[in-house]
UniProtKB/Swiss-Prot annotation:
PANTHER family: URACIL-DNA GLYCOSYLASE. One of its GO terms (biological process) is base-excision repair, AP site formation via deaminated base removal. Its EC number is 3.2.2.27. Keywords: Cytoplasm, DNA damage, DNA repair, Hydrolase. Belongs to the uracil-DNA glycosylase (UDG) superfamily. UNG family. This is Uracil-DNA glycosylase. The keyword DNA damage applies. The keyword Cytoplasm applies. It comes from the Bacteria. One of its GO terms (cellular component) is cytoplasm.
Length: 225
């Protein structure tokens, strides 16, 4: 694991990897990748932690589990690999991005440029079987990703937590709101986007807070590839 994570996350999380739940999770993943098609590719599972170091996290956008279609998931919540059509939730995120800050809708769905600026795109479950949403729920991932939220919560430097939908909002109890800033709304899914996601202005609100605390805002615009 030390080779996979950048050093800042390794220092924060190394004790987790020795715990029984993680050993069981690891064995389960070996079996799953051997016997089924599982997303994302093994080298991409920890991309959220690879692209965004512990010290550089400014914003967390919490997702549920990876996209379960071919070629979509690459270890960043809501993001898809270049060349793959953005799924409906991501299309709605782009609509809100345009309405909120006037950014053009990009010709791709990769959010890597956000991750490189300090946006931790974290799913609560990091793997999934092809075509089977939530198939790796309750297997141990939640314990690891809760610990990621916990180490950020303990950090002195404030973090913006963007929580879309009830699943993400269940994590509110882990966040000290006297120290960190929470932006919440319904999920960008087509089933709920019109119930309050559209018009919630998460991108400008996050930047407004970052500027208030003297931090660099995120450039949310996504250049075409």
């Amino acid at each position: 694991m030390k080779q996979i994570l950048n050093d800042s996350w390794w220092q924060q999380l190394k004790d987790e990897f020795d715990k029984p739940y993680y050993q069981e999770l690891r064995e389960m993943l070996k079996r799953e990748y051997a016997e089924h098609t599982v997303y994302p590719e093994p080298n991409d599972i920890y991309n959220a932690l690879h692209y965004t170091s512990y010290e550089n996290v400014k914003v967390v956008i919490l997702g549920q589990d990876p996209y379960h279609g071919p070629g979509q998931a690459h270890g960043l919540s809501f993001s898809v690999q270049p060349g793959v059509n953005p799924p409906p939730s991501l299309k709605n995120i782009f609509i809100e991005l345009q309405n909120d800050i006037g950014a053009d809708i990009p010709n791709h769905g990769s959010l890597v440029s956000w991750a490189k600026q300090g946006v931790l795109l974290l799913n609560t479950v990091l793997t999934v079987r092809r075509g089977q949403a939530n198939s790796h729920k309750g297997k141990g991932w939640e314990q690891l990703t809760d610990s990621i939220i916990d180490v950020l919560n303990k950090r002195d430097k404030p973090v913006v937590f963007i929580l879309w939908g009830r699943h993400a909002q269940m994590k509110k109890e882990r966040i000290d709101t006297s120290k960190h800033f929470i932006i919440q709304s319904p999920h960008p899914s087509p089933f709920s986007a019109r119930n309050g996601f559209f018009g919630s202005r998460p991108f400008s609100r996050a930047n407004q807070y970052l500027e208030q605390i003297g931090d660099e805002p995120i450039d949310w615009s996504l250049p075409n590839l």
